[in-house]
Curated annotation (Swiss-Prot):
GO cellular component: cytoplasm; nuclear membrane
PANTHER family reported in the protein's UniProt record: FI02826P
Gene coding for it: STS1
Location in the cell: Cytoplasm; Nucleus
Stretches the record annotates as Disordered: 37-56
GO biological process: nuclear protein quality control by the ubiquitin-proteasome system; proteasome localization; protein transport
Pfam families (UniProt xref): Cut8
Organism: Komagataella phaffii (strain GS115 / ATCC 20864) (Yeast)
Protein name: Tethering factor for nuclear proteasome STS1
Principal subcellular localisation of the protein: cytoplasm
UniProt superkingdom: Eukaryota
Family of this protein: Belongs to the cut8/STS1 family.
Function, as annotated: Involved in ubiquitin-mediated protein degradation. Regulatory factor in the ubiquitin/proteasome pathway that controls the turnover of proteasome substrates. Targets proteasomes to the nucleus and facilitates the degradation of nuclear proteins.
Keywords, sorted A to Z: Cytoplasm, Nucleus, Protein transport, Transport
Amino acid sequence: MSSLQTSFPWGFKKAVISKPTKNKRKIQEDIDTLGDAKSRTKFHPNNSNSTSRKHRTHAIMGTKLPLNTLIETLDHESLQKLVKSLVEQRPDVQEALYNAAPTVTVQVCIDKLTDKVENIKCNLPYKVDTECDYTYLRVKALVHEFFQALSDYMLNFLPPQEYDVSKSIEFLNGFLLKVLLKMPMFSHMEFKYYYKLTLDKLNTVYVNLIADFIQQKPTNILLLKDSDLAEKLLEINKHYEDYFEQVSQLLSQDEGSDIPERLQGLSNLLNFSSENNPLNGGVVSSVKGSW
């Protein structure tokens, strides 16, 4: 019989590698396997239960945009179309829109008319002279739109819509000095008609505004003389070949002088609507206001 050492030279005990260790490992593996099975059973129910729970979950339903968010999202053109469509479908809302709309300022109107002139220029055919009829025909619709807007804005600054004569004069001066001078001078007969009609009407409006203002109170002429109106009219007449000389003559009157009556010769002229254009067969008729 050979004698066995009581311990290994590396310091391990015999009990560590004895046969019972093998059985313990197998038992432990069985326990772990059983534990995993229970865990899967507990946290992963079968398909039927899972489907049942899904049916009980509340669904997230889509909704329309809130009106405030919708309006904020629309661009200028889309919002404009929306309002026009609403007015066409519901004419009864027009008065509510007028009451809720902010006051339109003179500067905003001048800026809008300037934008329309710039739009006309941008749409002119490349390297084609404005003397050519083809050039005007290319932008004819935009020119009509411009004159229609001018008519609308001018009426907005006349009595009985607007009684503040300073705003009326501000619009007239702004249009004559900042807008109309930028308009291309087309040689087409229709444009010449519109252009001449514009000057005729603006001269009539200007004379009547000043005459009415002075007749309300004779000392008002002193207010006009103390303003820069005389200088503005001097500049306007320079650009338009003294077309508004009659307005300047009113300012040169002394306090208490007889003021000529309102001009009536153009009171039956149309506004600048292309539908009423006599060149297109329209019938001349009276227009609202003093325009």
